């Protein structure tokens, strides 16, 4: 046939049996990839430190999605929360991976069967005997079935009525666990950070889908609408399906990048806006202030800060710090976090407490500037020593650590003070192991960044695909050169000019 690569799908355009076959094969590939990827991630995943080396630091992509749906245990005897277990049950990480691979194999066989037995009676129009699909009826069937699945997920799986529930955490990603969720039917259900909205929206959308499916099964479209929207053309199905997919891809790119109840920070890492807004820093200071109000010493108050919370307040966990073409996990960048060194508090010789200005997200380098509580610059690390007025040496800056591994340690030598001032630009200070993975010290993005980039990019491509195929199906007659208002039966090849009887070809 000699088709160019971008036209090869025309071979299934008027062949319902093989059109079904290639879609089943596509499902086999997707499911097989998911199962295989899960097994690969489980082979390289280290569950030993869920606080400082969580799944998102290790670049896990499919494990977070399994976890948010209620899978927490492994046949290897470990739990995602860090404990050990003896009876993980069939629906472990490996069980889900195996189920996907098994389903992939069954789809593979089904695809082969439908490719071989393509000419089935069900695909034929009784009146003409030619291949034909009742597309509005098929639409109704699919809408009805997807409505049942959507309703069932919201009413049973998420609520824990028949299922595990979903991953639910606090606003600071400290207490996350799988639990059942009650539907939120009030205005709070529209808050993207309220888990109850997931249950209520699936129940509502599923109910609507069931009713809409029954409507499309029982009511035929008007003839004018049927013809106007080209409902008899399979390319209309392709165009509208692409629209649904690219719309969903844009939505999930947004919920992933900006954060929501569906993308917990314990599973996907924090968002860039939490660094930009000093979200975790404010909570840490609030907790320290509350500790001081309870007559704790500064050291005791900082020692009560959870290591997990301090780790979120580190720029290396910002997904926007990864660069284009920097492949690999966060651990391959700045290294595996080993421990929190503590919170450094800088003071000059006059006793002013100094704060290091933090690096904004899109800077690779940033001047080291120390300001007091009023925002007045008191010290810095100068670019030109000859012109310096506020250098660490001149101002006599010291640093003392509170909490963490260096709790109570004071440094006064300028070289060490400057070292920790530079590191304080990046948030809380952690000891990082760069030797184990030969980490190069260049920040990487988290799975949150990869997911957003991938889905936003493909959504844009699919948007153009929707326009392309929508235009092809709506204006097919124009592209083919056939006047839709031409009532006379046209015999192709009879005239030199299509439909013009004055140009009848001469029979030789």
UniProtKB/Swiss-Prot annotation:
Cofactor remark = Binds multiple chlorophylls. PSII binds additional chlorophylls, carotenoids and specific lipids.
Q: Which UniProt keywords apply?
A: Chlorophyll, Chloroplast, Chromophore, Membrane, Photosynthesis, Photosystem II, Plastid, Thylakoid, Transmembrane, Transmembrane helix
The Gene Ontology biological process annotation of the record reads: photosynthetic electron transport in photosystem II
* Gene3D superfamilies given in the database record: Photosystem II CP47 reaction center protein
**Membrane topology type, per the record?**
Multi-pass membrane protein
GO cellular component term of the entry, any: photosystem II
Where, per UniProt, does this protein localize?
Plastid, Chloroplast thylakoid membrane
| Main localization of the protein described in the UniProt heading | plastid
Q: Identify a single GO molecular function assigned to this protein.
A: electron transporter, transferring electrons within the cyclic electron transport pathway of photosynthesis activity
Q: Where are the transmembrane segments?
A: 21-36, 101-115, 140-156, 203-218, 237-252, 457-472
On assembly, the entry states: PSII is composed of 1 copy each of membrane proteins PsbA, PsbB, PsbC, PsbD, PsbE, PsbF, PsbH, PsbI, PsbJ, PsbK, PsbL, PsbM, PsbT, PsbX, PsbY, PsbZ, Psb30/Ycf12, at least 3 peripheral proteins of the oxygen-evolving complex and a large number of cofactors. It forms dimeric complexes.
Task: Fetch the NCBIfam families from UniProt.
Answer: PS_II_CP47
- Family indicated by similarity: Belongs to the PsbB/PsbC family. PsbB subfamily.
Role noted for this protein: One of the components of the core complex of photosystem II (PSII). It binds chlorophyll and helps catalyze the primary light-induced photochemical processes of PSII. PSII is a light-driven water:plastoquinone oxidoreductase, using light energy to abstract electrons from H(2)O, generating O(2) and a proton gradient subsequently used for ATP formation.
- Mind telling me what this protein is named? Photosystem II CP47 reaction center protein
Species the sequence originates in: Phalaenopsis aphrodite subsp. formosana
